[in-house]
Amino acid sequence: MPLLDSFKVDHTIMNAPGVRLAKVMNTPKGDKITVFDLRFCKPNIEILPQKGTHTLEHLFAGFMRDHLNNNDVEIIDISPMGCRTGFYMSLIGTPSWEMVAKAWEESMKDILNVKSQDDIPELNKYQCGTCTLHSLDEAQDIARNILAKGVGYIDNEAIKLDMSKI
């Protein structure tokens, strides 16, 4: 089995919160697809709470589109990582990490302005696979933590995995 790009970085020295350029690829027609690692937590030290992560998924996807989509950039998907330390964001275009960080921080502010659980989009049994697995309080705690720490840059070369360690 091939070693995927996400496992070629040393998670023991990865800082968070931070934006990491995970991959850039071209479609057959030449469009650029960019994947960002939006690392909320320091791997193996912190973990996002399950209910808060699910709520964040519902809110973050829309708010990031509000702040980042433009004529040159369109978000395809934002999905939580299985390890619960962040999200992957795939998009058409190549925004700078600074643009991504600014949109992320603005999205966290938006999450803090959500008034009640009733305001979470698609929170019903028809549009959500586990509609009882949500916590606005946890999502807002995550947002407060990100804003308190600030979003930085994660340099792939600085955290390149020394393959002799595995």
From Swiss-Prot:
<dbReference type="Pfam" id="PF02664">
    <property type="entry name" value="LuxS"/>
</dbReference>
<keyword id="KW-0408">Iron</keyword>
<keyword id="KW-0673">Quorum sensing</keyword>
<feature type="binding site">
    <location>
        <position position="128"/>
    </location>
    <ligand>
        <name>Fe cation</name>
    </ligand>
</feature>
<dbReference type="GO" id="GO:0043768">
    <property type="term" value="F:S-ribosylhomocysteine lyase activity"/>
</dbReference>
<feature type="binding site">
    <location>
        <position position="58"/>
    </location>
    <ligand>
        <name>Fe cation</name>
    </ligand>
</feature>
<protein>
    <recommendedName>
        <fullName>S-ribosylhomocysteine lyase</fullName>
        <ecNumber>4.4.1.21</ecNumber>
    </recommendedName>
</protein>
<comment type="subunit">
    <text>Homodimer.</text>
</comment>
<dbReference type="GO" id="GO:0009372">
    <property type="term" value="P:quorum sensing"/>
</dbReference>
<keyword id="KW-0479">Metal-binding</keyword>
<dbReference type="InterPro" id="IPR037005">
    <property type="entry name" value="LuxS_sf"/>
</dbReference>
<feature type="binding site">
    <location>
        <position position="54"/>
    </location>
    <ligand>
        <name>Fe cation</name>
    </ligand>
</feature>
<dbReference type="InterPro" id="IPR011249">
    <property type="entry name" value="Metalloenz_LuxS/M16"/>
</dbReference>
<comment type="similarity">
    <text>Belongs to the LuxS family.</text>
</comment>
<keyword id="KW-0456">Lyase</keyword>
<dbReference type="InterPro" id="IPR003815">
    <property type="entry name" value="S-ribosylhomocysteinase"/>
</dbReference>
<comment type="function">
    <text>Involved in the synthesis of autoinducer 2 (AI-2) which is secreted by bacteria and is used to communicate both the cell density and the metabolic potential of the environment. The regulation of gene expression in response to changes in cell density is called quorum sensing. Catalyzes the transformation of S-ribosylhomocysteine (RHC) to homocysteine (HC) and 4,5-dihydroxy-2,3-pentadione (DPD).</text>
</comment>
<keyword id="KW-0071">Autoinducer synthesis</keyword>
<dbReference type="GO" id="GO:0005506">
    <property type="term" value="F:iron ion binding"/>
</dbReference>
